[in-house]
Amino acid sequence: MPIFTAQELAERFNLQLFGDGNLRIHGVATLTQASPEQLSFLANPRYLTQLLNSRAGVIVLHADDVKTASGTVLIAKDPYVTFAKIAALFDIKPAREAGIHPLATVDPSAHVSPTAHVGAFVSIGARSSIGASCIIGTGSIIGDDCTIDDGSELIARVTLISKVRLGKRVRIHPGAVLGGEGFGLAMENGHWIKIPQLGGVVIGDDCEIGANSCIDRGALDDTVLEEDVHIDNLVQIAHNCRIGAHTAIAGCTGIAGSAKIGRYCLLGGHVGVVGHLQICDNVVITGKSVVRNSIHTPGEYSSGTPLTDNRTWRKNAVRFKQLDMLVRRMMAVSKEKA
């Protein structure tokens, strides 16, 4: 585990230091759990009480909070971002040796960079390409005509079915499936006819896709995630969707076919997005909301039902069914008074 002094961290990240610059930091932790040899941070005033009682050796905080802390502190414009960068220094991953495991299967027409790591029980299909310094984890399946650019990682048991193109430094977690058939059906004489899904999936540079998430390939055009998109676990992105750069989508969200999500959007957990609509840039959708119409103005939107005690909720549920009747009565009374 690496060790850094407070002074070294201040110089590396251009931070203002108050206190003992020779203090040695062995790791990071929360305010409540940090030891005198660890660094923590304060980014939210609601945790001010934890700051006052913290044993952390070094604390990263905003200049406005410096008077509330004792001991060694590092002043940051954005303490949360700075903490993330410092924590990355302690996130040491074991090196993977370059080469193809003897239990992996690689089609003769596929290309694997000599600097890539291909783990056990991996299958790589025809005409697929694995770039430099890629990591293809145990049990991953890469179908035909897939391209994985330099520095990307499939952690384990990731499936790229076909026509999937990953950019540079893409990271995909276990159980994710990319390039599956989109849900395209047409009704004829009382029976469903499957619509061929002839497109692919394109993932931009620096994207991350969580465990057990699915991104379907397009029917004709590709399904696209632009650069630096972050997808949580258990997210469904249907065929022909386009997700704008720097957007983040939380777990259990479902996005129906051909929806277009803008850049720098945030979708909370369990959001539903109806197909064939557009959401502009810089939109926040709070958890459990359902987006039924296009959004053309940046801002925060909600449609989820707020939590109340069960007794109140049951009463309101009954009243909700009576809303139409009550409105009609009010309109009738209003007409009589007029």
Curated annotation (Swiss-Prot):
Pathway the protein acts in: Bacterial outer membrane biogenesis; LPS lipid A biosynthesis
Gene Ontology molecular-function annotations: N-acyltransferase activity
GO biological process: lipid A biosynthetic process
Protein name: UDP-3-O-acylglucosamine N-acyltransferase
Family annotation (NCBIfam families): lipid_A_lpxD (TIGR01853), PRK00892.1 (NF002060)
Catalytic site positions: H239
Keywords attached to this entry: Acyltransferase, Lipid A biosynthesis, Lipid biosynthesis, Lipid metabolism, Repeat, Transferase
Family membership: Belongs to the transferase hexapeptide repeat family. LpxD subfamily.
InterPro entries linked to this entry: Hexapep, LpxD, Trimer_LpxA-like_sf, UDP_GlcNAc_AcTrfase_non-rep
EC number: 2.3.1.191
CDD domains from the UniProt entry: LbH_LpxD
Role played: Catalyzes the N-acylation of UDP-3-O-acylglucosamine using 3-hydroxyacyl-ACP as the acyl donor. Is involved in the biosynthesis of lipid A, a phosphorylated glycolipid that anchors the lipopolysaccharide to the outer membrane of the cell.
SUPFAM superfamilies listed in its UniProt record: Trimeric LpxA-like enzymes
Alphabetized HAMAP family for the sequence: LpxD
Coiled-coil regions, chain positions: none
Reaction it catalyzes: a UDP-3-O-[(3R)-3-hydroxyacyl]-alpha-D-glucosamine + a (3R)-hydroxyacyl-[ACP] = a UDP-2-N,3-O-bis[(3R)-3-hydroxyacyl]-alpha-D-glucosamine + holo-[ACP] + H(+)
